């Protein structure tokens, strides 16, 4: 797959953000790797009230799209990805990425619930807990790093 296809098909999903800063950091990282679509699910508190409008501003300025949905199940149902990767410190190796894929990070740095992980596959990005934004950065770099100038 060429870089343009990868940037169109790799979709970061920022799940359950509670902090404005964590939400915006994940959005900025995603935009920095040139992704064309970013999804936010289950935003709560100030992340929902202040972070979402600011995230929309950043995404629109970059020419990308932001989708805000209530839940991960809706994301999988509507976007119909070929694979859903829940990024973490445990799990399987990601392997080769092809087609439309979702990279899901838990923005409140909690563990994913079993009902959430049942929608895809838990993958190990790094064996240490470095936070959700760092996990997203490492996963995007693994897949899109060669596409970024």
Task: Pin down the residues of each PLM region.
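Post-transcriptional modification and biogenesis factors for structured RNAs
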Residues: 1-149
